[in-house]
Amino acid sequence: PVAREEFPDKDVTVRGSVVDDFGAKADPADVRVDGAPPDHPAGLLLLLHKPIGLVCSHDEREGPNVYSLLPPRWRTRNPQVTSIGRLDKDTSGLLLLTDQSELVHRLTSPKHKVPKVYRATVSTGLSPALVPLFASGTLQLKDEKAPCAPAGLKIISPREAELTLTEGRYHQVRRMFASQGAEVLTLHRARFGHLELGD
């Protein structure tokens, strides 16, 4: 049903007809408020295919951001829409956005071990010895106190790999490969938990 209290002093239509029975059921895709689709209630969750060149920060001084891709009404929501984890400016792929702080915590906390799958191309040939090293949970990154959590590495070709992480440290994928002498040239997040990008 369309709730009158949701839209006080607004012109609500369903398939172009003004609504006078706010108890009637309607397909959300057919509802318009003052001629525009209604804003979603609290609990917004968006799956975005982030392009290269955008940052995941609300601070516009850091450059063009992913929030510029959203309709204006979602950019001004309260609570604010924010990314669940971040992808750096040079990384593309699956990015989740939400206005639910509890969901952000649940999906980014290392204790929940939510898998994130990345595809990387690197500057040098990848040794099969990296597979057990990344899986061991002993890989120590520079300036980090604790070693990386075990990570699944699948070598697709000499310079391409798929890496599954259950934690999200700063530039972790790039730093893991760099620690072994391989610079990441392209990086794409293909999956977050059970969600993945289609073709």
Q: What are these model-derived regions, one by one?
A:
Residues 1-199:
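Basic, flexible Lys/Arg- and Gly-enriched helix-loop patches that mediate nucleic-acid binding at interfaces
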